[in-house]
């Protein structure tokens, strides 16, 4: 069956790149079937913000188990946002929630964002994910 991993809130996608590298060098017992790496930013915003991101994105996209998605808003219903992806993944074994941000520095606002996501959409997340990491 294999394992499906969702990475939410990537910035420059270096975390996804490192995860992929580790999985290649040290394959887990259970085969990784897919990695879906997402960012809130559009692709052009990622390329503009992070100088080495094009190389990173190209490396991720070259691997057949990786799907990179931009413009994914974790505060909104995810299942619909993921339905039209090449992998059409709507269920994941592991979810890694990286760096949710509002695009500016404000600790109280960031805390409110996370609270909003977890309070407002717990049922949607439980239906979408088989296990939260």
Spans of features found by a protein language model:
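Short amphipathic alpha-helical molecular recognition features
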Residues: 7-11, 70, 87, 110-117
């Amino acid at each position: 069956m294999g394992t499906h991993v969702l990475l939410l809130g990537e910035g420059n996608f270096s975390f996804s790149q490192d995860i992929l590298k580790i999985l290649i060098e040290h394959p887990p017992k259970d085969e990784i079937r897919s990695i879906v790496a997402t960012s809130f930013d559009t692709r052009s915003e990622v390329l503009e913000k992070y100088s080495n991101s094009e190389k990173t994105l190209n490396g991720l996209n070259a691997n057949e188990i990786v799907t990179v998605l931009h413009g994914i808003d974790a505060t909104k219903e995810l299942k619909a946002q993921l339905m039209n992806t090449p992998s059409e993944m709507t269920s994941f074994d592991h979810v890694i929630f990286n760096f949710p941000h509002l695009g500016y520095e404000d600790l109280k606002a960031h805390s409110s964002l996370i609270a909003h996501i977890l309070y407002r959409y717990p049922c949607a997340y439980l239906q979408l994910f088989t296990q939260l990491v």
